[in-house]
Amino acid sequence: MIPIVYNVRSVVRRPVSTTLTALGVGLVVAVFIGMLALANGFRAALAKTGSDANAMVLRKGADSELSSGLGRDVASIIAADPHVAIAPDNRPLVSPEVYVLVPLGKVFDTTQVANVVVRGVSDQAWQVRSNVHVTEGQRPASGRADVCVGKRLVQRFPHTGIGETLRFGGRDWKVTCHFAAAGSAFESEIWGENEQFMPVFRGEVFQSITFRLKDPAAFDEAQRSLQGDKRMTVDVHRESDFYAQQSRLLGTILGFLAVMITSIMAVGAVFGAINTMYAAISSRAPEIGVLLTLGFRPWTVLVSFLAESAFIAVIGGILGCLFALPLNGIVTGTTNWSSFSEIAFSFRVTPLLLFAGLTFAVVMGVIGGFFPALRAARLQVVQALR
Amino acid sequence: MALVEIRDVYKSFQREEQRIDVFTGLTLDIEAGSFTALMGPSGSGKSTLLNLIAGLDKPTRGTVRVAGAPVSEMSPSQLAAWRARNIGFVFQSFNLLPVLTAYQNVELPLLLTRLSGKERTERVKLALDVVGLADRADHYPRQLSGGQEQRTAIARAIVADPTVMLLDEPTGQLDARSSQEVLTLLQRLNSEFSKTIVIVTHDAHAAERAKMILHLEKGDLIEKPRVAAAAAR
């Protein structure tokens, strides 16, 4: 094989065209990683929201909490079900919840409103959702118009500081705490007591009931038993599956957009690589002639120039990764199309994504280098040496 | 049996509408261990003949055999493998790869063999030593003089111990002193190491160093091979 050092040094000898081509590839890789980091962050936020150990009950046929409604009788039936885990204080770990969207003005421009999830929970909700914990302040006291604000909302919406008063549903609500939920979608919600929210919003009806399974492995049995109960018409989901499902539509669209947009940009980068490699090959025709004269076979010339093109692309890929890395952790928000609610999440640049970016760069390099390399391999020795 | 056998070779090129006949039935033998100079005016077919022997070009008709191998009938892939083992080629403009050191340039043909790294190192050192450039192994071509570049190219041509060395105007771009050095080296390779050498040259002084001079004109050998003065001495 033609030694790789020949290609590496040839690349270094033409720094301007190498840098420009690598930058082109780098920008595409950065956009590719950035967009997938967005989709990744969105999926991760929702995936982390649900727990495998919890089950979620909705009205039969409801595909989101918004379209669901369950009466107090259903809440009582579920609380008494033997599949529900029991807390040390002997109370069932069940949280019948009110789920509504309220329009709130954003902090930088209060004329822009976003639909924020307001979730009325039972006292047990804080135990049922083991990933949720108060980071600052005191939990809302029972019987009072208190709310706890998810930490992702604090920076984005006004009047969310502890001790401040939020106004929604025609009433004032005192912010008594902030909570974190391991980066999940709960962090984009406002929680208060379900009994306080019920009369204000949708009357004597809960939107969902979430409970901790006594045995998470026995979910199927719990589902069969509850769905078969003639006293109610409900669907039972594993909480983790429910939130994964919620992320599917927008997550898929974001992923699709990432591929679409970067594919279009990649065409430009590939043409850049083609141009660079054609120029390199035409100026190095005598060198190729020498290699063929020495006895290197045409396919080794092809592989050598493909490797050179891939090498330039890898430089571009590394640049792209460096451009994209600072995106990691940046918080952004969007409307989840499954629930129509604002959800804030972080860009997630994972090692796998960086690897995918580098692989994408190599693919661009190989595609861009193929036809020039083929031309190099097909050069007639006598003509190449002239 | 001659080492190089050229039998009734025709070679023509198409240039736009015009057909140019370079050889029309050339027959020639080159013996093993000979040192042959091919002379003649530009366009007489000297370089084409060298290319045919090296398998870089194919005759329109006729056969070229080198050490019994039917060069004119091999596929490009077979030719590449055959050239790597049998041909050491030296160009007028040296044609060293500018991004590789003298050592790496000389090592190139050995990368096509099954020699170990250690064996390759020994062979490269020996070849550079033979051409008197052992101390320039780490120099890049731009750091060498023309004569040194050509001697490096000769080291590259001999390192794999080929059957035939073919040199196309090896002194064409060198000053008188460097030319003498290169020609002396070629004589040494022929006499001490029994290398079969064919050089194409315009330079009568260079041709005088060969044992045999062949004159080509318009594709024909215009006189019988004659023994050069150097060989007669």
For each feature predicted by the language model, list its residue ranges.
Chain B
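Conserved beta-strand-loop-alpha-helix hinge in the C-terminal portion
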Residues: 212, 220-233
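ABC family nucleotide-binding domain
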Residues: 2-218
